[in-house]
Design a protein with these regions (language model features):
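Short, proline-centered helix/strand-breaking motifs
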Residues: 15, 26-29, 90
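The N-terminal extracellular segments of secreted preproproteins, especially immediately downstream
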Residues: 11-13, 36-39, 141, 153
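Bacterial Sec-dependent N-terminal signal peptides
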Residues: 1-24
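Residue-level signal for pocket-adjacent positions within structured domains
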Residues: 12, 32, 183
Length: 207
């Protein structure tokens, strides 16, 4: 059974945060991966174990043409990898800040390495709140709305909001694994995000 999951990502392209004062709900885990990557199963196992443990992560699997197939990667996901300059698979970007390259086969797991990153980030507060909702419009058309409010001080420049639409429980055998999870199907509105420079922004898109 396939399951659609929504993740909202506030991405700081430049600058840093200060006077952060709102507890975060989760840690963003962008994993650059592919079904043809022999070392990527350990990354997938690490993410699965963290979710099973109930840890507050937002996994976003970014498949690219480097190690995946056209049914999993898009021009947007390739662009996302180029943005970070990804050269090794798998590579984890935690909150867009911490980086861990490397993995293993289907009998191995990156859990301990990823958990260490989670522990570093989960208590880092944020100057933003994000509320996400979605509704069915008609037929197979949905509308997603993200409301971002600035509640603290932030000295970052070029701040952007991006919504990642992911799909999980795709029945596909790959590198000894039974299914593919958190596959990025769309970056809304695009991989460039929506510029945010004021106190509040509402992003509404249909897909």
């Amino acid at each position: 059974m396939k399951k659609l999951l929504f993740s909202v990502v506030a991405i700081l392209l430049f600058g840093s945060l200060s006077a952060q004062n709102v507890a975060r709900e989760c840690v963003l885990f962008e994993v650059f991966t592919g079904v043809n990557c022999p070392y990527c199963p350990a990354a997938a196992n690490g993410i699965s174990e963290m979710l099973e443990e109930g840890l507050a992560i937002a996994p976003v699997a970014i498949h690219t043409s480097a190690f995946s197939t056209p049914d999993f990667y898009t021009g947007e996901t390739n662009a996302r990898a180029n943005f970070y300059g990804i050269g090794s698979y798998p590579t984890l970007k935690a909150d867009g800040i911490l980086t861990k390259a490397g993995g293993g086969n289907a009998s191995q797991s990156m859990y301990s390495q990823y958990k260490a990153f989670y522990n570093q980030r989960i208590n880092v507060t944020s100057p933003f709140t994000i509320d996400l909702s979605y509704d069915f419009v008609e037929g197979s058309v949905c509308q997603v709305t993200a409301v971002v409010n600035k509640v603290g001080q932030c000295d970052a420049a070029n701040l952007k909001v991006m919504i990642a639409l992911t799909e999980s429980h795709i029945q596909r055998t790959w590198q000894g694994m039974p299914e593919v999870n958190a596959v990025t199907r769309d970056l809304i509105p695009t991989q460039n995000g929506t510029a945010f420079s004021g106190e509040s922004i509402t992003v509404t898109e249909q897909f």
